[in-house]
């Protein structure tokens, strides 16, 4: 082997290891810049010496020419579907069937449990460790050849990370698109007047079935393996869970939520846990997949028609249903945004009865081609506000009415305008508009802003309707007599509200900035502004160039902040708030180079009292930490607030350093 070949082999091996650490272990050992440097070095060498180019090189993910169509591939081992369970009773019946069928029933059945990913099932064949072929599930017997497209997925290894690869290994898994990538893809499509995707599953399907792999390479797809088909020249582990861990060890990504559960009760607990964290996973799932862990028992149980007896999918309640659109109301938000809200025939979706859904804006009404009286597809995912994602136009009745977007505010009758380049139409009434005033005040008292407990939305509405308050500063001028005259406001409730208002006067600069409700300034941006400028006066006096030096503050956000401080009314409100006693301590945050959390993995759990979860996360990231959502042996610190639960228990079990909120704040300030 020549020196060039040795150099190429070493570069490829190093890059494969870095890809494995980044995509499979989620624990990169080098910065992206180092990977990029080696990648470009490898690419340059391969261009100089094309005779040594190999198909499994990290540089060869993209490059195939567009196809005229997909050829078909017959699965040597059929890719079967799963039977479903929709209730605890149906799952228990599944377990009972297993127990009745087994000749020698073990003392306790162990299940390998995993989230049911909402993507596309694929088969990937490795021959002597090199990715050779990939196919869709198709009808279970015949699928489509998507080899060129699968090669573009960054977390799919082109060569297995083992010196002793199987002669043939078929990996089966699910390809899906995480929420963050889906949002980026649709945002790009909107900006370039391209068609958007309705949901991440459609986006993943459309991306995998692109005839041009160069397009697929730009789509943020991810693979999670869930099983093995063909396996030749290798002694596989004897349990399903161990096989998945073996796949992970040779570079194949598996889902981090996979768990072993002993007995039906633990499985049902897993189902509930996954359902509870569903909205925070960052990708779509529609249930759990529950498999007998012991391969020998799987073989004994066998199959029925097109499904295994040893596995089932326990599905979540439906997230999409059909219903009728009865009417549309137009609501006014804190910044004057006019939002059309669909009034629906009540329908049970994902565990709750839904009667309202957002239609977002006029563009969405036009895109959906929706009318009052239509049959619509309603979707509710986790805590997300229900939304209409489709219309059955073929069911449109003759008496359907068009939706007409108003030209004047439905609350104050001010003119509605739409600024060029923005999708949102806005009322021009400002604080003259009672609806905007109410929402601005509700934001001001909210938990992540001034956190004024005892002053809720209904109280704000009464105060505004009776013309008792007009600005946030007016809240601090309320007295016992005024409050006790309101509906459902006894002396005790009024005293509690006044005490909360008094306590809220002592806050942080970041919370105060966020509470002001400056457009585009969220919790994290407010924290960055506070850390950068240190004082309110410095922020107020900053010019556009200085504002854009703050992390995550671009031209648009800087302009919003700059204009806010140039409006005399806003300055007067802020000065009035200070005059009413609102104050904060000046806290300087340590630089990233001198703090405990630089390059460490940190998990937040429980309720923090001094700042919101997003605030703390942004602060840690600013200090150079990686903030993770789950505790593992790779975790360096757990910051535990009030009512910390299972994450704290796991940290203690793994002897991971646990810090209270006070200890955390002491470490990051000086």
Curated annotation (Swiss-Prot):
Molecular-function annotations in GO: DNA binding; DNA ligase (NAD+) activity; metal ion binding
HAMAP family: DNA_ligase_A (MF_01588)
Record keywords, A-Z: DNA damage, DNA repair, DNA replication, Ligase, Magnesium, Manganese, Metal-binding, NAD, Zinc
Residues at which Zn(2+) binds: 409, 412, 427, 433
Family (UniProt): Belongs to the NAD-dependent DNA ligase family. LigA subfamily.
Active site, UniProt feature: 116 (n6-amp-lysine intermediate)
Cofactor field: Mg(2+); Mn(2+)
CDD domains in the record: BRCT_DNA_ligase_like (cd17748), LIGANc (cd00114)
Record's function text: DNA ligase that catalyzes the formation of phosphodiester linkages between 5'-phosphoryl and 3'-hydroxyl groups in double-stranded DNA using NAD as a coenzyme and as the energy source for the reaction. It is essential for DNA replication and repair of damaged DNA.
GO biological process, one term: DNA repair
Protein name in UniProt: DNA ligase
Positions annotated to bind NAD(+): 32-36, 81-82, 114, 137, 174, 291, 315
GO cellular component: cytosol
Domain BRCT: start-end pairs: 592-670
Domain of life assignment: Bacteria
Keyword hit for Acetylation: no
Documented EC number(s): 6.5.1.2
Catalytic activity: NAD(+) + (deoxyribonucleotide)n-3'-hydroxyl + 5'-phospho-(deoxyribonucleotide)m = (deoxyribonucleotide)n+m + AMP + beta-nicotinamide D-nucleotide
Coiled-coil ranges per UniProt: none
